Amino acid sequence: MSWNQQELTSSNHTNTSPNFNYINYVQKPIEMYVFIDPLCAECWSLEPYIKKLSVEYGRFFTIRQIVSGQLSNLNVDVFEKPKKLKDIWERTAKRTGMSCDGDIWDENPIDYPYVPSLAIKAAELQGKKAGKMFVRKLQENLFINKENISEEKILLNCATEANLDLEEFERDLFSSSAKKALQCDLKLTREMEVDYIPTIVFFNQSVEEEGVKISGLYPYEIYKLVLKEILQKTPIPSSTPPLIDFLKHYQVVGTKEISVVYDWSLDKTEKEMKKLQFQQIVERIPAKYGSFWKYIDRSKTQDAAQR
């Protein structure tokens, strides 16, 4: 079932009971299939909303990340036109506030777009959590640092940053297992008729119905409406965690991501982060559009000093 805003806003089920929480669920009732491509600027721009959904309503859903191959599936024609991709990235960054530096397509263009997708499946062989962390590190290196993430040395750096087992990752990178897993994702993309990325398909695991498909980027309220429609109740959002806990969990986050999660203006977010920077809790990572912030892990610093 495709997303229809009129249908969603017509739902009148409510549930304001404080008892309506994750404790009632042995299994989370909703599964979200998130179709992405590591080279897609809009997929990167979806990150603030995924984080906010996870913070407020993560007790209701699990995320299954699917590599769609929309950009990576050997689409040679597109990758012979770096100026076109540069323009897309620049427009996306200005529109969404999530920095993606299109200069990479002039300075260090991606040679083999298929490889990063294969690397994600290799990382996922170490677990779903490892796979998600690896995707994030790919995106940070690509969109912020302008690294060519089709190069093996950059992939190994990403694997290190994601705390993967490097020997296992190297062994799996071009393995038949990783290739088979990627083919399964591409097949699922076709079967679900996903022709645009990012796309999220929401499924209620307790009801045999078609999923609700949302293709593209929408305001956060739309994703909340979908959850309400599928749950047939109005879920109560969880409280946002203390900012330092949020930063410690995600390690590297953008000003835009923090502002979305905490419902702050960009100016207020900058002021709060500068306070933490002054306290040496975070360090600023300058970007072409806005800033990112890296949590300073004191325990690692102390361990290194003791060695």
Curated annotation (Swiss-Prot):
SUPFAM superfamilies: Thioredoxin-like
UniProt keyword Cytoplasm present: yes
Keywords associated with the record: Cytoplasm
Keyword Calcium: no
InterPro entries cross-referenced by the UniProt entry: Adapter_SpxH, Thioredoxin-like_sf
Function: Adapter protein required for efficient degradation of Spx by ClpXP under non-stress conditions. Interaction with Spx stabilizes Spx and exposes the C-terminus of Spx for recognition and proteolysis by ClpXP.
Family: Belongs to the SpxH family.
UniProt-recorded name of the protein: ClpXP adapter protein SpxH
Organism: Oceanobacillus iheyensis (strain DSM 14371 / CIP 107618 / JCM 11309 / KCTC 3954 / HTE831)
Gene: spxH
